[in-house]
Amino acid sequence: MLKRSKFETTQSQIMHRAEELISAASNRYRITVQVANRAKRRRYEDFENNEDAMMKPVLRAIIEMSDELTQPEIIGEL
């Protein structure tokens, strides 16, 4: 029996987004560390807020970072 995801983002979409991040980065190691750090930060934020995360922090970090790459207007200017 196949396990269905609760999210509209499929594994192939996640892989495609991760590949986009890696190909856009000048350094594969650095982008990997950035994704890991964001996921770690999200995990601690979810833990501090007593939220039950519906999506794993690494997947959420990949989605957020790829969205920032493809849609720079969501970051906003400081």
UniProtKB/Swiss-Prot annotation:
<dbReference type="Pfam" id="PF01192">
    <property type="entry name" value="RNA_pol_Rpb6"/>
</dbReference>
<dbReference type="InterPro" id="IPR003716">
    <property type="entry name" value="DNA-dir_RNA_pol_omega"/>
</dbReference>
<keyword id="KW-0240">DNA-directed RNA polymerase</keyword>
<comment type="subunit">
    <text>In cyanobacteria the RNAP catalytic core is composed of 2 alpha, 1 beta, 1 beta', 1 gamma and 1 omega subunit. When a sigma factor is associated with the core the holoenzyme is formed, which can initiate transcription.</text>
</comment>
<keyword id="KW-0548">Nucleotidyltransferase</keyword>
<dbReference type="GO" id="GO:0000428">
    <property type="term" value="C:DNA-directed RNA polymerase complex"/>
</dbReference>
<keyword id="KW-0804">Transcription</keyword>
<dbReference type="GO" id="GO:0003899">
    <property type="term" value="F:DNA-directed RNA polymerase activity"/>
</dbReference>
<dbReference type="GO" id="GO:0003677">
    <property type="term" value="F:DNA binding"/>
</dbReference>
<dbReference type="InterPro" id="IPR006110">
    <property type="entry name" value="Pol_omega/Rpo6/RPB6"/>
</dbReference>
<comment type="function">
    <text>Promotes RNA polymerase assembly. Latches the N- and C-terminal regions of the beta' subunit thereby facilitating its interaction with the beta and alpha subunits.</text>
</comment>
<dbReference type="InterPro" id="IPR036161">
    <property type="entry name" value="RPB6/omega-like_sf"/>
</dbReference>
<dbReference type="GO" id="GO:0006351">
    <property type="term" value="P:DNA-templated transcription"/>
</dbReference>
<comment type="similarity">
    <text>Belongs to the RNA polymerase subunit omega family.</text>
</comment>
<keyword id="KW-0808">Transferase</keyword>
<protein>
    <recommendedName>
        <fullName>DNA-directed RNA polymerase subunit omega</fullName>
        <ecNumber>2.7.7.6</ecNumber>
    </recommendedName>
</protein>
